[in-house]
Amino acid sequence: MKKQNLIHAEGLVTESLPNGMFRVLTDNGCQILTHISGRIRRNSVRILPGDRVKVELSAYDLTKGRIIYRLSNKSSND
C-alpha cells in the first residue's frame, strides 16, 4: 500500500543526534529533523554527517521527515 501526500527531497546530513535522529539540510535550504526508515535500520546502513541522503516528508509537517536512501558519494579516490 503506497502512502499518499509524501514529498521527496535530497539533502546533506549536517548533524547526528541520539536515537537514530539526524539533521538534514535540503538542497532548497530547509533544515529538517529526520529519522532512519526501518529498511535502512534493518540492513545496518551507516549514515554519517556529510552523507547525501534522500528524504521523505509529510505534506502536513515539513520540518520532520524520514531518511529512505543514502546516496553514493561521487568524490571517492578509488
UniProtKB/Swiss-Prot annotation:
Q: What is this protein's record name?
A: Translation initiation factor IF-1, chloroplastic
Its organism's taxonomic lineage begins at: Eukaryota, Viridiplantae, Streptophyta, Embryophyta, Tracheophyta
Q: Which residues form the signal peptide?
A: none
**Alphabetical list of Pfam families matching this protein:** eIF-1a
Q: Which domain of life is it from?
A: Eukaryota
Q: Which keywords are on file for this protein?
A: Chloroplast, Initiation factor, Plastid, Protein biosynthesis, RNA-binding, rRNA-binding
Q: Where is the S1-like domain?
A: 1-72
Q: Which CDD domains match?
A: S1_IF1
Q: Which organism is it from?
A: Pinus thunbergii
Q: By its UniProt entry, which InterPro entries does this protein fall under?
A: NA-bd_OB-fold (IPR012340), RNA-binding_domain_S1_IF1 (IPR006196), TIF_IF1 (IPR004368)
The Swiss-Prot or TrEMBL record annotates one GO molecular function as: rRNA binding
